[in-house]
UniProtKB/Swiss-Prot annotation:
Bilayer-spanning residue ranges: none
Presence of the UniProt keyword Disulfide bond in the record: yes
InterPro entries: Bowman-Birk_prot_inh, Prot_inh_BBI
GO CC annotations on file: extracellular region
Official protein name in the record: Bowman-Birk type proteinase inhibitor II-4
Keyword entries, A-Z: Disulfide bond, Protease inhibitor, Serine protease inhibitor
SMART domains listed in its UniProt record: BowB
GO molecular function list: serine-type endopeptidase inhibitor activity
Protein family according to the UniProt entry: Belongs to the Bowman-Birk serine protease inhibitor family.
Cited PROSITE patterns: BOWMAN_BIRK (PS00281)
Amino acid sequence: ATRPWKCCDRAICTKSFPPMCRCMDMVEQCAATCKKCGPATSDSSRRVCEDXY
């Protein structure tokens, strides 16, 4: 899968084909290409992009 962001250190993917992935990186601000940006569960001051790709 092609990810819509430059950096994704913590990707979680399903075992389906093609796999669906989410990037679990905690960032200060989501990338402009992120459609759904939410607060990180472990640190509410950080953000996580909730888009699947």
